Amino acid sequence: VDTRLLRTFTTLARTGGFTSAAAELHLAQSTVTVHIRTLEKELGTRLFDRLPTGTLLTESGRRLLEGAEEVLDAVARLRAGGREGDGAVRG
């Protein structure tokens, strides 16, 4: 799963709306929609209930949110660790 899709997913879950998620991510609203549809297709499940007032996580969405946040935190730690190192590749 593409981490960009996970970032869009977690932002939408937190903000509750496609417009606010798009603004926070500096993306077009249509891009947020495509990211969520792509993620739902890849996972084979609906992640949000779309309501007139915003979005609500489904049970599948709630389960994914926990794992997605962990993955994104791990990626951030790896990136931070890479910047702190001396740039040498060891093996």
Where do the PLM segments sit?
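The N-cap/first-turn positions of alpha helices
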Residues: D2-T8, Q29, G61, A68
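Interdomain hinge and pocket-entrance segments immediately C-terminal to HTH DNA-binding domains
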Residues: T53, G82-G91
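Alpha-helical residues within the helix-turn-helix
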Residues: A23-E24, K41, R62
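A short LG(V/I)-centered, amphipathic sequence patch enriched
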Residues: E40-L57
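Short helix-boundary/capping micro-motifs
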Residues: L12-H26
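Conserved amphipathic alpha-helical core elements
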Residues: F9, L39-E40
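Alpha-helical linker/hinge and terminal dimerization helices associated
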Residues: E42-L43, L64-D86
